[in-house]
Amino acid sequence: MNMKISRIHFLCNFFLLNFYIVFSQNKISSTDIYSANFASEKFNSTYSVIKKNNFITLSFDDLNLMDSDYYYQINHFNHVWEKSNLFKSDYIEGYDDNLITNYSNSFNTLVDYKNFRITIPNKNLKFKISGNYSISVHDDYGNFLFERKFSILEEKAKINIEFFKSKNLKNYNSHQNLDITVNCSNCNNLTGSSSQLKLVIIKNNQWSNKIVLSEPDFFFDNKLIYKNISYKGGNEFYYFDNSSINSTNLRIYKTELKDFYNSYLRKDIEKINDTYNYNPDINGKYLINRSIENYETENDYSRVFFSFKPIEIFDENKIFIVGDFNNYEISEKYQLKLENGIYYGNFLFKQGFYNYKYCSINSLGEFNLIEPSFWQTENNYTVLLYHKKNTDKYYSLIGFKEQKSDLIKN
């Protein structure tokens, strides 16, 4: 079936027998896809957890409106996203390389687009095992467009997280420490010479900042304890709200209508590393405007104008905006340009509430968020527990916990 497609940016969704489903960020080569998201009750995000018997839907908008057919494929990975040594039939039941057929045209918008939706599992594809997966999309010539990572959880252990200020005097004002407790009915079955256990931690849905631990600090029959896992606190996210697309607010000082809506943000000034100021955010996530009944197809797009004044010019470094809205993707699609000591950029955003940060990339390709770091900053941490018997060919996901650092102990 032909569908007009070109802008693809993905979202994936799932369920499975006794399994939860966990989603992460994705990789994109197409510049023509916007608003790819998993929609939960609270946020649109690149990361979600779904209990058994629930379906999840991936949604994305194509603004290019060219006719083409698109397909999705599934792959399985280990705990650090290296491809598993498995056949397709080991981890999926049904067909791989399925055509995406569910789409709708935008209605009553200045920016025309098609909204595509994929609900998984479906009649063509179901999942056999837990662990890390990706779903990738390609065109009918086999050209790769984008992929999204996700994980399926078969829960066998409960996880608890506690937050503390750093004990290291050097990092006392800038870092957060996590103590993680894994509760299992018989931890002896998960550890020892006959199997491997891996604990993975990420902050604010960024796989690039993952910490992987192979051994607990303390071991008991029904409990594993991991102590003093250290993260930079960072700072709260910048935000804007273009839900009411032709209105101004605290962050948008001007709007204008040309071929489509333009929204101008107040200048962002780089924060210096002195005093923490509380600024409520949603930890990098975003929320598409839901005051409209058919919000997937009736929300419009506006071009949002950014300006950022750094403390000093970054010489050869390139500056980008990142957040869950683009899966922290580094691409020219969200790059700012330097002019008279200020970085400028303008990018399309669907009506909604957005969190974002500025980051720099140096000549070596090293990624750094442009922000001070405070121990008080509220972040969202995700802990994943993977298990592999020596006789198995894959890592299963047996524990999951997502928690905000809103209560940090001294």
Residue ranges and their predicted role:
Residues 34-76, 171-184, 294-306:
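Contiguous beta-strand segments within globular domains
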Residues 81, 125, 139-145, 244-250, ...:
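Short acidic/polar inter-strand loop motif in beta-rich domains
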Residues 264-315, 395-410:
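Basic K/R-rich, polyanion-interacting modules in nucleoproteins and related proteins
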Residues 25-51, 156-169, 281-293:
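Short, compositionally biased P/S/T/A/G/V-rich stretches that sit at domain boundaries
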Residues 112-125, 130-137:
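Ligand-binding face of N-terminal immunoglobulin V-set domains in extracellular IgSF glycoproteins
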Residues 1-26:
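Bacterial Sec-dependent N-terminal signal peptides
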